[in-house]
UniProtKB/Swiss-Prot annotation:
Name of protein: Probable potassium transport system protein Kup
Bilayer-crossing regions: 24-44, 64-84, 113-133, 151-171, 182-202, 225-245, 261-281, 299-319, 351-371, 381-401, 409-429, 433-453
Source organism per UniProt: Burkholderia vietnamiensis (strain G4 / LMG 22486)
Gene Ontology MF annotations: potassium ion transmembrane transporter activity; symporter activity
Subcellular location(s) per record: Cell inner membrane
Amino acid sequence: MNDTTQATDAAHAHSTHQHSMQALAIAAIGVVFGDIGTSPLYSLKEAFSPAHGIPLTESSILGVISLLFWAIVLVVGIKYLLFVMRADNNGEGGVLALMALSLRPLDSKTRVAGALMALGIFGACMFYGDAVITPAISVMSAVEGLEIATPHLSHLVLPITIVILIALFWIQRHGTAMVGKLFGPIMVLWFVAIAALGVYHISRVPGIVAAINPYYAASFMADHLLQAYVVLGSVVLVLTGAEALYADMGHFGAKPIRLAAYGLVMPSLVLNYFGQGALLMQNPKAIENPFFLMAPEWALLPLVVLSTVATVIASQAVISGAYSLTSQAIQLGYVPRMKVLHTSELAIGQIYVPVVNWLLLAVILCIVIGFKSSDNLAAAYGIAVTATMVITTVLAAVVMVRVWNWNRLLVGAIIAVFLAVDLGFFGANLLKVAQGGWLPLGIGALLFFLLMTWYKGRHIVKERTAADGIPLEPFLQGLLAHPPHRVSGTAIYLTGNDKLVPVSLLHNLKHNKVLHERTIFLTFVTRDIPYVRDDKRLSSRDAGGGLYIVKAEYGFNETPDVKAVLEEFGRTHDMTFELMDTSFFLARETVVPTHLPGMSIWRERVFAWMHQNAAKPTDFFSIPANRVVELGTKIEI
């Protein structure tokens, strides 16, 4: 009886685990695979663009489909799903998390560490270059289905695209938790639909299945040489969104993402691309829009609607990714403080960054109006994706060797294959710089300059502050030996360095000549891991006389919370804190550019402007504005 009960419990636990895994996989399909899942809308059409001069013969169709197939297998199926997703930072993926992991065993002052940091930041910047193109090309290519379904409405493609995009960004501030539950089932329907379309056309031209043989890809490259290399720049469009598999790993876990990819997403994509190839072999004129021309006439409008919804979901994933990346970059010190709002009390990862939201919308609308069609925009797409892919491969190699201590020869062999593929795609996309590739490169380069300027500027400010600083604990001992007038209440001094006296305390003593009976020096520190356990978050030192030095550690995926820190500190020290009875003292730094060693004067002016426009600490740390005392200080850099 006991054995039977144990067996039943084990079976129940296994069933529950399987159900949970399937639920996570469906949720992942709605968030992770939107971008790569909507690539069939434009990828094959762009590969046979008239500008490439590739004839629509049977051999070239088989060759291009073979290239698409092996690109998906090698980059998505093997590189990302089997190798890169192993390189997680405490479960978190993405280029910044990977950069933080690769830097962990290195001295931050070495050139290697500096180069890896610059690579990681550039990869993050290129993500933003991708983030402004994905919503534009995805939504536009879906709405362009109207040109096939109802040609007399073709003049409405641009206005409808603009309205959809404005609506999408407008609802961001309200959060997407409610509609987000529908994303998974809708995208499952999308993948089933595109797979069914593919199967129908493959059944009519079974010969297309021969494209599985890599001989056709190699033969196509050999026959067309330079033209074929140019086509590689379009083939990479089937991989847009592959980085999301890794970047969103922290939300869903590696197993559900792999289950979704191998179980539904990759088979559906392959079937659809092969179906489009079969259609072209039967009717080369279908190159006008092979995706929508796969559908029977009665299904065209429903397919346009479904594809539009799917592209909105894909865009949502990119937008959410931009918020998350910005939040990580703020915590790691690469971006000025910005207002970050949490749109859900239950889901930690659901945030909204107003500045990023409206900047993205402004740039995306300019792109849509400027490029006018998905065909024109396709040339701009790909270069940001491939640049990030190359950077991810390099950082993953460093992690394999330096963090995991894998055999260098083994890592070299694996990475050589991946880099050969990545650099091949990247080189092919460099050929498209003049046609539109300049756009993501320009956006990425501008952001890289701003982020590196901010990081360097903050480093200089810290050096200047440390050089002029006074050690905190000896100062406090002297203060207690000759105390100023003590006043009732609690004072909290926010400081960036728990070893030095806050400038705000010096100013308060100089001008007001008082010290509160309970004084706390609070420092927030961001670790190179995504989350810090609650029991490891706080450390404190009692300096005596009601003076406490408190350090709160957060991961780069977390947002510092003053109220929560005070509550936790109060619990461990048998104290109570009322925010409205507490005074917060902050130093308001004014950065003054000078000719001192550091950065060139014009970069210092850019940094000073960024510093001046960063979100106020009161907004960022959610401190009641009427409880804050700001004391000004000038820092020459």
